[in-house]
Amino acid sequence: MARGLFSRAWLSKTHHFQARLSYIRVKYLFLTWLAVFVSSWVVYVQYSTYTELCRGRECKSIICDKYSKGIIDGSACSSLCEESKLYFGRCLSTKPNNQVYTGSWGDQDGVIKCQLSDVLHYELGEELEPKKEITLFEKPTRGTSVEKFKEMVASHLKAKVGEQANLSNLVSLILSVADSNKDGHISLPEAKSAWALLQLNEVLLAVVLQGREHTPKLLGFCGDLYVVERVPHAPLFGITLPWPMDLWIPAGMRRSMDQWFTPSWPRKAKIFIGLLELIEDIFHGTFGSFLMCDMRASSFGYTDRHDLRLVDGRRVVAEEAFKQAMILQRCKDHEDCVYGADCRTSCDLSEQRCTAEVAQPNLARACGAMKDYLLRGAPFHLQEELEKQLYACMALKGSAEQMEMEHSLILNNLKTLLWKQISHTTDS
């Protein structure tokens, strides 16, 4: 009897163990299936995103087709389409219609930028522009004389930068760029390429600030595809995480993480001084004032010597063009009157239209965007004075023209404070 009881107990335990083992197997099988499903979904989404955003082959095919038909011409055309000396590298695109790739052109490292669209919007920004479109490479038309093309360029630039005493000099600069083979003549294909490029803020800025150290040099173009020199370190700060991880990290923690991966403080101070110098260059510059409407870290980078470079100038817009576009913008509240990331005006509620004057100058928005970057790691004896000056800078209101003396005083005080601190250090 005892033996029977023992057998039944042993069988019961064996059955219980087998049932538990089956449950564990099913559980792990389900978890394995779930992991495979999630991984496959992530890979699919990443691949779909990549194929949607990264269309370099399509861009090259369109440009080279136009070049082979004699519609466009430019200094980069033969290297891109005939000699295969201009190579597309890593995709950096964030929007399907604005292709950005690292590139190699002979012994030069560059960044290739190409607009993928059947129609090209005048570039103040699609969200602000009236519905004004041109078919790409339609202008100038066959039979247009060089003198007529010059008038077209002058009229367009006047609308962008306003009436300038030296507008003719800017027109001459544009025509010099248009003459890509430097033979002293502008062909119709060269003129079509130049006209398409002239609609882009970044190209206009590159011409206006050519020779200045804080904007990448324009290396060449073909149609509306253009190549600028590559900036070694970009974005200015922060880390790039896979988007599933990025979704789960709180915004405050993300900002702190971004500040962990930055150069030493003297080098950060030198980079910030470069930003102040860039603001000086575009405030009452040779060809008018410009507004920097995206002060995020992704818009900037720096060289191996820690000199600041503007890496994305699409949201740097001539102040005159900004004003003209804003007064055409309808609004219901102040939030409707924003261009780019941070250029704001107010809403005239009685007229339901945005006002023309920007709420804060470039300097105030730069100080606000870079405050945490600059204060983190600052020498203890400097922190109080630096913070005080940064907050005074952030308090600037209205356009720089309205408070020119205060603007210049704050900018020079910040530069002096930082240079005095880092001028004797090897890091700077």
Swiss-Prot record:
Name the UniProt record assigns to this protein: Divergent protein kinase domain 1A
Record carries keyword Coiled coil: no
Post-translational modification: Among the many cysteines in the lumenal domain, most are probably involved in disulfide bonds.
Membrane topology reported for the UniProt record: Single-pass type II membrane protein
Entry keyword annotation includes Membrane: yes
InterPro entries tied to this protein: FAM69_kinase_dom, FAM69_N
Transmembrane segments: 28-48
Phylogenetic classification of the source organism: Eukaryota, Metazoa, Chordata, Craniata, Vertebrata
A Pfam cross-reference name: PIP49_C
Keywords: Disulfide bond, Endoplasmic reticulum, Membrane, Signal-anchor, Transmembrane, Transmembrane helix
Chain's gene name: dipk1a
Organism this protein belongs to: Danio rerio (Zebrafish)
